[in-house]
């Protein structure tokens, strides 16, 4: 198993404190890995700085070829990546193989093509006797912090656009789920020039803070919690670094009385509980119009209770464990707080399961009120609440009454209503009669405290560039 760091093109052991990496399905230690030391962090950043002078001037074609080679290598090692991700995260193995690995490969291939298609305003004489042109140049050294819910996927979302744009990257995966990023480092070592991509390991307080605060780091990209985002923004503010933040969500799922309730129930069963609900776009905050509320509660209860929990390697498993014991405790506390409210009905689930591993039963909580914490706060687990509403104006207010602004969905057969709501919902994405659908060509990113900046799409590529104006007098 690959456990070494990648610094300046060389795989090396960490020199810092050793940290245990767990299998959440069993609670057992997989292995221990030594963190990067401050000297190693500095060496990784300095390697990126030194290489940037050359890598930043390479042609888009050359960078694209490297990304395509990495995509091919991931595809060729798909089963090994999937097994590592499943073991380290508790994800059902078949979900990683069939859903995540193909999407990861596609992200690298998309940005390989996008690198060769950056656009800008037409050059011209906007001032007589002077010709102006626009350049999109790489920023420099990017520090990327990836989360624990989709370790390899989020690494791909960060690495592909940054490298395609000509930046050099130092990435730190979560200390909870580092195995696939470290495996990726071993493949990248033989594809990219030394220093272009560096992979570290360690906790936020010991490695992340040193990395993001390094004076030579020009940009910080984070996918994580609001608290982590706020910490990094405060930490990097004195240096005025470029930042790119995706900080979670609490997606409203608005169901009108003309919606296809079977489709809604099946959709929430899939989109609310994929990856054990550990997804910032999860369909977790349901609003149902009064006329269909009881019927939808019944259908959702039947759908959610039919989800099969089990071992990640079992092909029939739909729901795996949560990622860590600490997170299991957070989810349990959130549900217990909701259950203590007299108006909340537990339709199914509501507690962790017996036995080994960090499993929490798929949970549906009915009759939640707008002000309830279960409606307002991100639980990030297999927990869905449902709230009754009366009319379009009310549900629009409630849908937008959130500090989050990442994703939302509207379920209705009324095209006009769908357009009205999608235009007014304060979310980076609104799906109509579906949820959770992501493609490399379209942007993913939020508003409000869900952060700013886009992943995927040409907009994501542009986020890792500097717009510059060149004027020539003649």
Swiss-Prot record:
Q: Which gene encodes it?
A: patD
Native species of this protein?
Salmonella paratyphi A (strain ATCC 9150 / SARB42)
Q: Which CDD domains match?
A: ALDH_ABALDH-YdcW (cd07092)
Task: Cite a single GO MF annotation.
Answer: NAD binding
Also noted in the record is: 4-aminobutanal can spontaneously cyclize to 1-pyrroline, and 5-aminopentanal to 1-piperideine.
Residues involved in NAD(+) binding? 146-148, 172-175, 209, 225-228, 280
Q: Which Gene3D superfamilies match?
A: Aldehyde Dehydrogenase, Chain A, domain 1, Aldehyde Dehydrogenase, Chain A, domain 2
Instruction: Report the catalytic activity.
Output: 4-aminobutanal + NAD(+) + H2O = 4-aminobutanoate + NADH + 2 H(+); 5-aminopentanal + NAD(+) + H2O = 5-aminopentanoate + NADH + 2 H(+)
The record, for PANTHER family, names:
ALDEHYDE DEHYDROGENASE-RELATED
Q: Summarize subunit and interaction data from the UniProt record for this chain.
A: Homotetramer.
Q: Which family does it belong to?
A: Belongs to the aldehyde dehydrogenase family. Gamma-aminobutyraldehyde dehydrogenase subfamily.
Please list the GO biological process terms of this entry: L-lysine catabolic process; putrescine catabolic process
Q: Give the top-rank taxon of the lineage listed in the UniProt record for this protein.
A: Bacteria
Protein's pathway = Amine and polyamine degradation; putrescine degradation; 4-aminobutanoate from 4-aminobutanal: step 1/1; Amino-acid degradation
Name-wise, this protein is Gamma-aminobutyraldehyde dehydrogenase
**Active site, per annotation:** 246, 280 (nucleophile)
Give me the segments passing through the membrane.
none
Q: Which UniProt keywords apply?
A: NAD, Oxidoreductase
